[in-house]
């Protein structure tokens, strides 16, 4: 009987700790800021996958259930494309390099297993001008584990953004959490 109680406690305590940390984050009236890096590849295309890299930041707006998100992303055809499709020529001009600024204002914050998500409509630029894929639905999922409560981020674009970034989540890392 004691071993069943111990096993039950061993299973429930980590869940309660994670729920408590998320609850404390959600109930704190101060704004919480998270930031990190996206480091991903788009799905395979006829020209090859794109490398997608850049910094992001997210601000949880206290108890409002809202958040603001921004990312500055660089995209270029991958090294794999250079080796298989471009005869090993690493000329940056041939790699289709471009930038995107992604902004989501007043996104809705909801709890998910192991963290939270922010969803809403994002504005997207390409090389500083409006992108034809803007506006697009965007879901940002921030998760973690028992040692690091918020360690991972994943960005998933809806159409028309998914036509450019792909339908799979773009992974990244949480580097900093500030309260």
Residue ranges: model-predicted function:
Residues 25-31, 110-115:
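N-terminal helix-cap/turn-to-beta initiation motif at the start of protein domains
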Residues 11-21:
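Bacterial N-terminal signal peptides
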Residues 85-105, 154-179:
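Edge beta-strand at a domain terminus
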Residues 49-136:
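Predominantly extracellular/secreted and cell-surface proteins with exposed
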Residues 26-77, 163-179:
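N-terminal segment immediately downstream of the Sec signal-peptide cleavage site
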Residues 131-154:
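A short, surface-exposed beta-strand/turn
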Residues 40-44, 122-130, 159:
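Short acidic, glycine-rich loop/turn motifs
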Residues 2-12:
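Bacterial N-terminal signal peptides that target proteins for export
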């Amino acid at each position: 009987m004691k071993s069943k109680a111990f096993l039950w406690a061993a299973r429930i305590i980590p869940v309660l700790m994670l729920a408590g940390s998320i609850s404390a984050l959600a109930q704190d009236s101060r704004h919480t800021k998270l930031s990190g890096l996206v480091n991903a590849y788009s799905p395979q295309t006829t020209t090859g996958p794109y490398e997608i890299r850049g910094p992001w930041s997210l601000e949880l707006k206290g108890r409002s259930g809202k958040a603001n998100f921004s990312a500055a992303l660089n995209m270029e055809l991958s090294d794999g494309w250079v080796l298989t499709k471009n005869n090993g020529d690493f000329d940056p001009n041939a790699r289709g390099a471009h930038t995107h600024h992604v902004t989501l204002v007043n996104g809705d914050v909801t709890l998910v297993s192991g963290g939270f998500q922010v969803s809403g409509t994002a504005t997207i630029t390409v090389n500083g001008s409006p992108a034809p894929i803007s506006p697009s639905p965007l879901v940002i999922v921030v998760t973690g584990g028992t040692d690091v409560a918020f360690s991972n981020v994943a960005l998933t674009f809806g159409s028309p953004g998914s036509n450019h970034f792909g339908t799979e989540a773009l992974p990244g890392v949480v580097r900093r959490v500030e309260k």
